[in-house]
A protein has these predicted regions:
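Domain-level signal for soluble alpha/beta catalytic cores
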Residues: 1-377
Length: 377
């Protein structure tokens, strides 16, 4: 019996969520930033582009639809800025990637954090209304530990002082973030959302043993931050409805076709794969930077793994036979029925996007679909 069609995520031919912004969206956002386009005009441009994107996702045969993150500047910061008690600030520098620095923004705690009236709920309702038969609208948001990590950094003047004026301890901060996420998750569920994805780059940092060594972090320190990440993410998930699927995507950075960190999953697998209460892990495996499949032996029984074997960082199409072979290699550690396929990340984690064309983007999606049909027909 075919297992190609799934009732909810993960899907055999899946995506991470973001897509290249069309020029009309880029132009509208630039005009809005310049003060020559009002909020209504910006929303109209985004709405039109998202409708077109959803049509293309349907035409590609995807079971999942997203808004491509067209209403965001970043995959993570816009969500943080939408929480009560967190504000947008310019950082001293951008995030440092290999050969490139990102735009310079961060998130600063300025008051008690809560999740009421988050703008992403309205964003989701727009996509939900576009669902077709057998399709599921997905909402992607940064993982709770990602928000914790961002606001506890020292990326702009006064960031730490502002945080500690509100939350004296990390424990108080973590509790507040978890509660805020539970509010947003409940509101998304009430809006009809049945698939939420936590995007999480914190684990990519801990995979990079060279970077960790430079920070002076000890094995005990690594264990503590890993346990904190799992505990905070689980606290946000706690009490979710049974029919709400929450998955997570682990990334090593995806900005303008470059990356921030490298290293296999070995350091984090005993914590993340074994203990996080998500339904599935969306994992990068597109280059040797992500290591081998052996850490998948730590995946808890019954959990699902989406193999990110097709890169979004380059236009060249992967060899289908080679990808099929790698899927079967992964099946040595996770049963084939619990494996799925997707690109390694989104196509535009930030609005600048990766270095490929829209046609090349859709060719990647078509490749994922063809391979999934071969493996799970």
């Amino acid at each position: 019996m075919s297992t190609l069609i799934q009732p909810n995520a993960p899907f055999r031919a899946d995506i991470v969520g973001s897509f290249l912004r069309p020029q009309a969206v880029k132009d509208a956002r630039a005009a809005y930033a310049a003060g020559t386009l009002d909020t209504a005009g910006l929303k109209a441009a985004e709405d039109e582009a998202i409708r077109d994107l959803v049509d293309k996702q349907k035409a590609a045969g995807l079971q999942v639809i997203t808004d491509g993150e067209f209403r965001r500047s970043y995959w993570h910061l816009d969500f943080m800025w939408g929480l009560n008690g967190i504000e947008r600030r310019t950082s001293r520098t951008g995030y440092m990637f290999h050969d490139e620095e990102t735009t310079a923004d961060t998130a600063v705690v300025t008051g008690p954090i809560s999740g009421e009236n988050h703008p992403f709920v309205e964003h989701f309702k727009f996509v939900k209304a576009l669902e077709g038969k057998g399709q599921v609208a997905r909402q992607t948001i940064p993982a709770p530990i990602q928000t914790f990590s961002e606001v506890t950094l020292d990326r702009c003047d006064g960031q730490q002082e502002s945080l500690r004026a509100v939350y004296k301890t990390d424990e108080e901060l973590a509790d507040a973030i978890a509660a805020a996420y539970r509010t947003v998750i409940a509101d998304l569920y009430a809006a009809g959302c049945r698939n939420i994805q936590f995007d999480d780059c914190t684990w990519g940092i801990y995979c990079d043993t060279d970077f960790v060594a430079k920070t002076g972090m000890s094995p005990v320190d690594l264990q503590k931050v890993s346990e904190l990440g799992v505990a905070l993410n689980n606290a946000a998930i706690e009490g979710k409805p049974d029919d709400l699927v929450i998955n997570t995507h682990v990334c090593r950075g995806n900005y303008h076709s470059t990356y921030a960190f490298e290293g296999g999953y070995d350091p984090i697998a005993p914590y993340l794969f074994a203990n996080e209460d998500v339904d599935a892990f969306y994992l990068e495996f597109d280059t040797p930077r992500a290591g081998g499949f052996e850490p998948l032996k730590h995946v808890a029984p019954g959990k699902k793994v989406v193999l990110g074997l097709v890169t979004t960082k380059a236009a060249e199409l992967e060899d289908e036979d080679a990808i099929v072979e790698r899927i079967h290699e992964a099946a040595k550690y996770v049963p084939l029925e619990n494996l799925y396929l997707s690109p390694q990340c989104g196509f535009a984690s930030c609005e600048i996007g990766n270095k490929l064309t829209e046609d090349e983007q859709w060719a990647k999606i078509a490749l994922v679909k063809r391979i999934a049909e071969r493996v799970w027909k």
